[in-house]
């Protein structure tokens, strides 16, 4: 089936901050969009809905945190719940979950290497993690010809 045309948004859900990234319609380059405050979840969903209306993505990909062994802990449960509600809020735009085992680690190492100071750097790190999630999603689709990760069912 090859690569579907169209923009995507990727979301890195953290406790305090939510990093957002997007890509061009050809799915070649993933770029940071913004960091959404994460503590007020309904407000975060509203802001993400506005971004979906603005960017008109064909799908939104969320990073699903797993342990290195592939198990799911409390963080994954939280992301699944967030994804479920987001899917309802932005329907009919599909939401997908992508394994993000290493992304935040990779993002913070990359930024540390480039000299980003931590407090201000945190929101940059969230966006960088979202960029990496999106790059992995695009790469996975390029290689497999299938939509990345797993779909989130909309429960009405």
Swiss-Prot record:
Subcellular location: Cytoplasm
The name this protein goes by in its record: Putative pre-16S rRNA nuclease
A biological process term (GO) from this entry: rRNA 5'-end processing
Keyword Hydrolase included in the entry's annotation: yes
Gene3D superfamilies: YqgF/RNase H-like domain
A Pfam family it matches: RuvX
PANTHER family: POLYNUCLEOTIDYL TRANSFERASE, RIBONUCLEASE H-LIKE SUPERFAMILY PROTEIN (PTHR33317:SF4)
Protein family according to the UniProt entry: Belongs to the YqgF nuclease family.
Keywords: Cytoplasm, Hydrolase, Nuclease, Ribosome biogenesis
HAMAP family listed in its UniProt record: Nuclease_YqgF
Function: Could be a nuclease involved in processing of the 5'-end of pre-16S rRNA.
Coiled coil: none
Domain of life: Bacteria
GO molecular function: nuclease activity
Enzyme class: hydrolase
InterPro entries per UniProt: RNaseH-like_sf (IPR012337), YqgF (IPR005227), YqgF/RNaseH-like_dom (IPR006641), YqgF/RNaseH-like_dom_sf (IPR037027)
EC number(s) from the headed UniProt entry: 3.1.-.-
NCBIfam families named among the record's database cross-references: RNAse_H_YqgF
Any single Gene Ontology cellular-component annotation: cytosol
């Amino acid at each position: 089936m090859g690569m579907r045309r169209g923009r995507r948004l990727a979301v890195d859900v953290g406790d305090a901050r939510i990093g957002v990234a997007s890509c061009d319609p050809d799915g070649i380059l993933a770029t940071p969009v913004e960091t959404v405050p994460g503590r007020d979840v309904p407000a975060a969903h509203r802001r993400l809905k506005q971004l979906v209306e603005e960017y008109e993505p064909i799908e939104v990909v969320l990073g699903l945190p797993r342990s290195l062994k592939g198990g799911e802990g409390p963080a994954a449960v939280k992301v699944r719940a967030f994804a479920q509600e987001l899917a309802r809020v932005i329907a009919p735009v599909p939401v997908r979950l992508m394994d993000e085992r290493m992304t935040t680690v990779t993002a913070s190492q990359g930024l540390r290497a480039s000299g980003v100071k931590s407090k201000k750097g945190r929101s940059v790190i969230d966006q960088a993690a979202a960029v990496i999630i999106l790059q992995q999603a695009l790469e996975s689709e390029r290689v497999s010809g299938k939509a990345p990760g797993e779909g989130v069912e909309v429960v009405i």
